[in-house]
Amino acid sequence: MTRHHQDRFLTTHVGSLPRSQTVVDQIFSLERGEPVDEAIFDQVMAEAVDEVVRRQVVAGIDIVSDGEMSKISYATYIKDRYTGFDGDSPRRTPADLLEYPGFMNRASSGGGTPTYRRPCCVGPIAVKDERPLHNDIKRVKDAAKKHGAKQVFMNAASPGVVSLFQPNQHYANDDAYLEALAHALRHEYHAIVDAGLILQIDSPDLGLGRHMMYKDLEDDVYLSRIEKHVEALNFALVAIPADRVRMHVCWGNYEGPHHKDVPLATILPTVLKAKPQGLLFETSNPRHAHEWETFAEMKSDIPEDKILIPGVLDSTTNFIEHPRLVAQRIQKFAEIVGKD
């Protein structure tokens, strides 16, 4: 999946990066259905991707991305690319925030919650418009070539995370919905890999789903559901080499109590069944920083070909971690599976 380096660990991130107000204005105009000049939109996005790739290269990031500049959200962007999605759906409140309503109200009133639509699945899912995907691919490849980035990844939603944020109102049951999503998303996955990019599957449904979509289920029922999510993903990836894919699992990138997060030990056996060779996961926030121990305890269960990509910086704090702390976090995992 990635180059191995003799002298140091390669660096990357999980995708979404800050956007300029100009980019935000263009994206939300499109989201609201307002007239958008296609040429201006393309120019704004191309310039934004060029700049964000340049900054990643300057910062020393080895495996860069387009920062998801053109996407309204890492999961709901599919409504612009596939048929079958329309309307809006009620927001599901995470279980941890339900127990702290005062905090939840402050967070929502302070502008910390998204205002974009989360449509429902209301009809058959099929490819509607390939242009946004191919435009994204072209922009990031052009920027990578210009600035000398050697490796590039591109994000794509997993079938499970689409089902998490866009409820099914069309298919007979959740299994049928996942199957339809896997068939449709396979097209996007192949296009990204065929373009020479590393495919990153965003699958927070495996973690976040526990205290959001499946918060009322018993653990065994929840685990059986995410097993289905992994099966759907593996079906979509059946013809793609594992070493061209990595998967991002998290418990929700928001500042909150997170005391309802499912322990990594509970989901790791299921997560490790997913085909992607690379596994990106949280390991630097107060709720999950201790879970390097889980990998140590389950070392024998980690497939030999898996590449662990721990998140050694926390994106929900304003603290700038000391380099020695970051080094310690890396060392803990290197001691478990080796630096290679």
Describe each region flagged by the PLM:
Residues 1-340:
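Domain-level signal for soluble alpha/beta catalytic cores
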